[in-house]
Design a protein with these regions (language model features):
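Polybasic, lysine-rich low-complexity intrinsically disordered segments
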Residues: 6-7, 29
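Intrinsic disorder
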Residues: 2, 10-17, 22-23
Length: 178
């Protein structure tokens, strides 16, 4: 093996104003999935606008992949789109038992694909290369990225939404204040 490491592509859909607006303002394009509680301790925030989900899914369409892992599917906003992608091996990992129960009921096609586990403690769910997607929990976004770096040989791309401050740190130059 050569000493050259493959770079990980990180595609981030980021719009703090839009996210705040989506979380606080009713819309005709919102999901009706709030059959459970948001847990601040888990950094939970859920997408409610299908247009934002479509933009994240659109970024996924620019990648070639056979396996896909969704981190923290929550209420299934992205999951419902991901389940419609043909010809891939899809899995989702969710820590919150309440969300796992909801997802299992709402999306029976997740049977055998939903992992009830803490992502930060999980082993790679695939032996081969896979893409990671998600609307990442705010309070552990950095830890998620460090965990993904442990799998850097298997993960060529990460696509999703991060909190603005986390995204700014990701793209900042070394030794900068960000």
């Amino acid at each position: 093996m050569s000493g050259v490491q493959k770079p990980i592509t990180l595609l981030v859909y980021l719009s703090t104003y839009q996210l705040v607006n989506l979380l606080t303002t009713p819309s005709t394009n919102t999901f009706a999935f709030m059959h459970y509680t948001l847990k601040k301790s888990l950094g939970q925030h859920f997408l409610k606008d299908e247009n934002v989900c479509r933009k994240i899914i659109s970024a996924l369409g620019k990648q070639k992949f056979e396996r896909l892992l969704e981190i923290g599917p929550g209420g299934g906003a992205l999951t419902k789109f991901l389940l419609n992608i043909d010809g891939i091996d899809f899995k989702a990992i969710e820590l919150d038992e309440e969300k796992v129960n909801y997802l299992s009921r709402a999306y029976p096609e997740l049977n055998g694909k939903l992992i009830h586990e803490d992502f930060l403690e999980a082993c790679a769910p695939f032996e081969q290369e896979f893409i990671i997607i998600g609307n990442f929990p705010y309070n552990i976004s950095s830890q998620i990225l460090f965990k993904i770096l442990e799998w850097k040989e298997k993960v060529p791309a990460v696509i999703g939404m991060f909190q603005k401050e986390v995204a700014q740190r990701i793209i900042s130059k070394p030794n900068s204040k960000s």
